[in-house]
């Protein structure tokens, strides 16, 4: 009896911890596929508080189809905890999780300059490290 109760208890907690996806239903426009996306996310490699794979899990749970992790180039408050970390690292860590979850992952970064061009996101990059320059001119 104890084994049966243990099995039922274990099954309940195992099944209840499975990630549930909140499906968002937005109709497609004829000839196009509608995607639910978030193109501005931060991780611990910037001023976020979670690991890149957690952002992918959140996106899946929220019903998103595509995300861009756009960690800051200039502002990295956790830099001393991850010395030498590449600006591409968050994408690299999230890539396998995104693929397994069916989430389209876009490589990007956030550029924050004191003067024009100011504050913007760069998406579809091949190398985020190329943006890490002292002057934008």
Protein language model annotation of sequence segments:
Residues 16-18:
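Boundary at the C-terminal end of the N-terminal hydrophobic targeting segment
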Residues 1-2, 20:
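Short, intrinsically disordered low-complexity segments
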Residues 22-137:
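A metal-dependent hydrolase metal-coordination microenvironment
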Residues 3-13:
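Sec-dependent N-terminal signal peptides
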